[in-house]
Amino acid sequence: MACSAMTKLALVVALCMVVSVPIAQALTCGQVSSNLAPCIAYVRGGGAVPPACCNGIRNINNLAKTTADRQTACNCLKQLSASVPGVNANNAAALPGKCGVNVPYKISPSTNCATVK
């Protein structure tokens, strides 16, 4: 009887541990676009990069924890650059460096996001 009670207790403890583990949320294009909205003026016209833009790039980079997240971010950036009129590809590609953020892919319409690790 004592063995059965200990087994049940162990199962309850294990179940609580599994249930309490936070589930990672996947990065979305909505998060990418809202974080990078302050960058639109810069990628269109150059000049000084707004601090809010750099904060957005840092935030996206920090949110992209997995390969799937980084590939999602890459694809979202490609979609955004195609949908926002007047984007200067050189300005977009220069953003991470100007903000001191190491992004593991080039921000470019020609980037193959499937190869992003």
From Swiss-Prot:
Disulfide bonds join 29-76, 39-53, 54-99, 74-113. Plant non-specific lipid-transfer proteins transfer phospholipids as well as galactolipids across membranes. May play a role in wax or cutin deposition in the cell walls of expanding epidermal cells and certain secretory tissues. It comes from Prunus avium (Cherry). Keywords: Allergen, Disulfide bond, Lipid-binding, Signal, Transport. The keyword Endoplasmic reticulum does not apply. GO terms for molecular function: lipid binding. Residues 1-26 form the signal peptide. The keyword Ligase does not apply. Belongs to the plant LTP family. Gene3D superfamilies: Plant lipid-transfer and hydrophobic proteins. InterPro entries: Bifun_inhib/LTP/seed_sf (IPR036312), Bifunc_inhib/LTP/seed_store (IPR016140), Plant_nsLTP (IPR000528). This is Non-specific lipid-transfer protein. One of its GO terms (biological process) is lipid transport.
